[in-house]
UniProtKB/Swiss-Prot annotation:
Record GO biological process: adaptive immune response; antigen processing and presentation; antigen processing and presentation of exogenous peptide antigen via MHC class II; antigen processing and presentation of peptide antigen; cellular response to glucocorticoid stimulus; negative regulation of T cell proliferation; peptide antigen assembly with MHC class II protein complex; positive regulation of immune response
Protein name: Rano class II histocompatibility antigen, B alpha chain
Ranges where the record places region Alpha-1: 24-111
Similarity-based family: Belongs to the MHC class II family.
Localization in the cell: Membrane
Cystines in this chain: 134-190
Organism: Rattus norvegicus (Rat)
Protein's gene: RT1-Ba
Coiled-coil regions listed: none
Gene Ontology cellular component annotations, sorted alphabetically: external side of plasma membrane; late endosome membrane; lysosomal membrane; lysosome; MHC class II protein complex; plasma membrane
Extracellular side: 24-218
PANTHER family: HLA CLASS II HISTOCOMPATIBILITY ANTIGEN, DQ ALPHA 1 CHAIN, MHC CLASS II-RELATED
Membrane topology reported for the UniProt record: Single-pass type I membrane protein
Amino acid sequence: MPLSRALILGVLALTTMLSPCGGQDDIEADHVGSYGITVYQYHESKGQYTHEFDGDERFYVDLDKKETIWRIPEFGQLISFDPQGALRNIAIIKHNLEILMKRSNSTPAVNEVPEATVFSKSPVLLGQPNTLICFVDNIFPPVINITWLRNSKPLTEGVYETSFLINSDYSFHKMAYLTFIPSNDDIYDCKVEHWSLDEPVLRHWEPEIPAPMSELTETVVCALGLSVGLVGIVVGTIFIIQGLRSVAPSRHPGPL
């Protein structure tokens, strides 16, 4: 695996409403916003700055392009965010991280094993466009590679990933998306690479389409249906005849 365990990762989260005073169970809210989640990876000189609402990403700041990227483009038409604020936070966290590394004698972060699940966005119909979702949870440190494979070959088109989204225990989760057209000829895998894994983990997915009935099965079903129908007709006729017979003796001739 190309990621070295010896590399140091620094993580500091500058958040709002993630750690309420008195504990998380003391405050109940209908909605929770997490603002300014900042992650800095010292070994690669990269970072991440995101805003979340109810666990969903609102936007992140592309630190290389120095611009705000909205999860849903229409959000950017209603509100705005100056990316310079994110750049200032990254500079502060980098400075603080250097101090913490010296105090901790450059102790590496503890690696947690991520958990991955693959599922489709909508019920699968062959030939109908759909989306595969690879949900990866319990990520720490937040350094991970997620790759989509079709028939064991990497895919680069139609793929999208969220940024790292924070959990209540300060681990992270991430979702990778793949737009595709289901086919019986294709199988898909979500490949996950992380420092905690000795080798990549593959999560397999292929369409589960009910097999069509054979001609023999169709014939048997039709014969059974016809037999049940005939039995119903015969039984119904018998009941009608018995009913008529039981009514006939009860009729008495009237006076002449």
